[in-house]
A protein has these predicted regions:
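Acidic/His- and Gly-rich active-site-bordering loop/insert found
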Residues: 1-64, 73-77, 81-89
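Histidine/acidic-residue-rich, glycine-tolerant segments that coordinate divalent metal ions
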Residues: 16, 56-63, 69-70, 82-180
Length: 180
């Protein structure tokens, strides 16, 4: 890869937002598609369809597993579909192609940039394993394959069972309890 381009992307600056403003006023609706590759070794057996058809990752241990290539395809397909009906549309549509979903950094960076500040409705999706048939769509409002990371500090105070046990503050117990 071009070293200058890689440097510009350092820190997760690889997100893309397509904004489609229509002539009639209306709500701002956003659709989010994650697009990061994962640290996964792709199969290299002769019967592996991506290898067989020439679209396997060129980089070892970097592949768009977890459906992320499908998410990008869905996003681009939605953009094409919307553009075909642009005369009938109102408001604004934002197509958010988010990097770093797996490491929980991409959404935070895009939110910090103000990309979703004006959004009235937000839709996100993830190719997954809830559907029972290949031609099915499962809609949920919960956190399917969602994650959040946070840092927490627990401070305690040591004591002795025979000398003022009531002064003890068990940080380890608090930390363990917060995990369950």
């Amino acid at each position: 890869a071009d070293a200058d381009l890689v440097e510009k992307m350092r820190g997760g600056k690889t997100g893309v937002v397509g904004v489609m403003k229509f002539s009639r006023p209306g709500k701002i609706v956003a659709f989010r598609f994650d697009m990061d590759c994962n640290d996964v070794e792709e199969c290299d057996t002769a019967d592996h369809r991506p290898l067989e058809n020439g679209f396997q990752s060129l980089h070892a241990k970097e592949m768009h597993a977890c459906g992320h290539d499908g998410h990008v395809t869905i996003g681009l397909g939605l953009a094409k579909l919307i553009s075909e009906y642009k005369e009938e549309m109102a408001g604004t549509i934002k197509l958010i192609f988010q990097p770093a979903e797996e490491g929980v950094r991409g959404a935070r960076a895009m939110v910090a940039k103000g990309i979703v500040d004006d959004v009235d409705y937000m839709f996100g999706g993830h190719i997954g394993f809830k559907a029972t048939k290949s031609d099915s769509l499962v809609c949920l409002t919960g956190g399917f394959l969602a994650t959040t990371k946070l840092d927490a500090s627990f401070k305690g105070e040591s004591s002795h069972a025979g000398a003022a046990p009531e002064r003890g503050r068990n940080a380890l117990l608090a930390a363990a309890a917060s995990c369950i």
